[in-house]
Amino acid sequence: MDSVLELVRKERRKNQIKREIEDNDRKIRDNRKRVELLLNLKEYLKVNMSYEEIIDIIENMQSDYEDRVDDYIIKNAELGKERREISKTIKDFKKSVS
């Protein structure tokens, strides 16, 4: 009994570690993107620019990023639909085999 419980604990810990690693990878990726964004912004901004020009650049960048977010949302929806279809196919296959 103890060995089964220990096995379950180890599996749960392994899954927890996997989720933590994935979370840290996302944080690393997000922070790298922020650094890249700031570097890009520094390239666009010039000393003699007006406030309005700077705001225009920022608004254009914001619009580009919002478009990307929308694209990713659509892609995730498509992937989710495909995953559900595959799950249904697997479930139906298992029923037919049993």
From Swiss-Prot:
Top-level taxon of origin: Bacteria
HAMAP family with a match to the protein in the record: Pole_loc_TmaR (MF_00683)
Cellular component, GO annotation: cytosol
Family: Belongs to the pole-localizer TmaR family.
Gene behind this protein: tmaR
Keywords recorded for this protein, A-Z: Coiled coil, Cytoplasm
Residue ranges of coiled coil: 7-34
Subcellular location: Cytoplasm
Primary location group: cytoplasm
PANTHER family documented for this protein: UPF0265 PROTEIN YEEX
Record's function text: Pole-localizer protein involved in the regulation of several cellular processes.
Lineage: Bacteria, Fusobacteriati, Fusobacteriota, Fusobacteriia, Fusobacteriales
Protein name according to UniProt: Pole-localizer protein TmaR
Record bears the keyword Nucleotide-binding: no
